[in-house]
Swiss-Prot record:
One of its GO terms (molecular function) is structural constituent of ribosome. InterPro entries: Ribosomal_bL19 (IPR001857), Ribosomal_bL19_CS (IPR018257), Ribosomal_bL19_sf (IPR038657), Translation_prot_SH3-like_sf (IPR008991). Coiled coil: none annotated. This is Large ribosomal subunit protein bL19. It comes from Kineococcus radiotolerans (strain ATCC BAA-149 / DSM 14245 / SRS30216). The gene is rplS. The keyword Ribonucleoprotein applies.
Amino acid sequence: MNLLDNVDAASLRTDVPDFRAGDTLNVHVKVVEGNRSRVQVFKGIVIRRTGGGIREAFTVRKVSFGVGVERTFPLHTPIIDKIEVVTRGDVKRAKLYYLRDLRGKAAKIKERREPRG
């Protein structure tokens, strides 16, 4: 079992910022179209983080042209170029599935204030 942990540790990303459910992220995703490759930004609210180690994943939700779009990313995949935390959200749940049913201002998440010091 220790051998598997060593193999997993070699594959983990080191440039992952600290984020949790309720935070707004910019996820820079590499998209391959034919023989060309470009970077596409997916901006949305993290509604969940699941798993652990190499199998850890997170789901980001955004509303695009009135349609809710959710995308689940493995955290340690090479497809992700970088992750930026735009704002920190103040929520009391680890899974924010209730946002799927909310519209407009009701779906807005309060910003978490960091203590000075």
